[in-house]
């Protein structure tokens, strides 16, 4: 099963969520997704429109970036506390404060699929970035064109 976008463009602006535990599906509804208090799950998949660029900002709670099965990561850029993931069709997500997120690979909060939880350092290592937490600048992942399974 490969998810497909239902919108051809992303909207501008910031979408602020509540202080509860939110499930936030990145589908182009705003340029910036901002969770507030609460333990939020950001569902990242092929639902993003082509050529879209979004940013995730969430500094409170225990938050998770969940990347669905069959989502292809084309390239990655890393700093000690952020990452920029580029998916097929030039879909780009920047996650600020990424060192405080859990990264769930292959899960799907909408159908109960668990997936595998990784720390930021483990997630970076899966793209060939050793010791991401001690980077002094930025580094590009050496593992590219990887499908999440």
Short names for language-model regions:
Residues 1-7, 82-149:
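Low-complexity acidic/polar repeat-biased segments
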Residues 12-16, 21-81, 91-102:
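Acidic, glycine-rich calcium-binding repeat modules characteristic of RTX/beta-roll
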């Amino acid at each position: 099963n490969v998810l497909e976008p239902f919108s051809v463009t992303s909207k501008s602006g910031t979408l602020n969520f509540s202080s509860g535990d939110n499930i936030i599906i990145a589908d182009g509804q705003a340029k910036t997704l901002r969770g507030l208090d609460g333990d939020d799950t950001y569902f990242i998949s092929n639902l993003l429109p082509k050529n879209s660029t979004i940013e995730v900002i969430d500094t409170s709670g225990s938050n998770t970036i969940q990347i669905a099965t069959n989502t292809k990561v084309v390239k990655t850029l890393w700093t000690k506390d952020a990452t920029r993931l580029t998916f097929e069709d030039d879909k780009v997500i920047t996650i600020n404060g990424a060192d405080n997120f859990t990264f769930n690979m292959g899960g799907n909060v909408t159908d109960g699929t668990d997936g595998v939880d990784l720390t930021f350092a483990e997630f970076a290592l899966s793209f060939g970035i050793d010791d991401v937490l001690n980077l002094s600048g930025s580094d590009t992942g050496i593992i590219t064109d990887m499908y999440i399974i």
